[in-house]
């Protein structure tokens, strides 16, 4: 295949538009719902995703936004619920989670706040109940709980401390 390729639904609406060069995807790819609403958009380079990727729900709300660097997730990444609320946000470097990642409950309250280094939890971790009260607080070292961890009840009251030692 070379050039622009298009597919259509039976109702005549555009279903898929993609660009090919030398038998591989190379350029903008767009996929549409039968209603004509954009479902998915991503740029390809030499057969690999490269650049921004966006997915949308049928109602037009974003489902996912992310960045690729030649087939590898690289850059800001966010996932959303159908009502537009954020589910997850963070950054990929070289295909691995790096830095701060946050996950949210359906009520938009922060669920957890994690630090990552090369796809492994590293450093301070905070988890919360749906009501926003702190559930647990501790540190990770190379994806394992380490040191002192504090646990709290849903009321926010302190519950206990546990010590994690990798020995």
What is each PLM-predicted segment?
Residues 1-167:
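Glycine/tyrosine- and acidic-biased, solvent-exposed loop/turn segments at the edges of beta-strands
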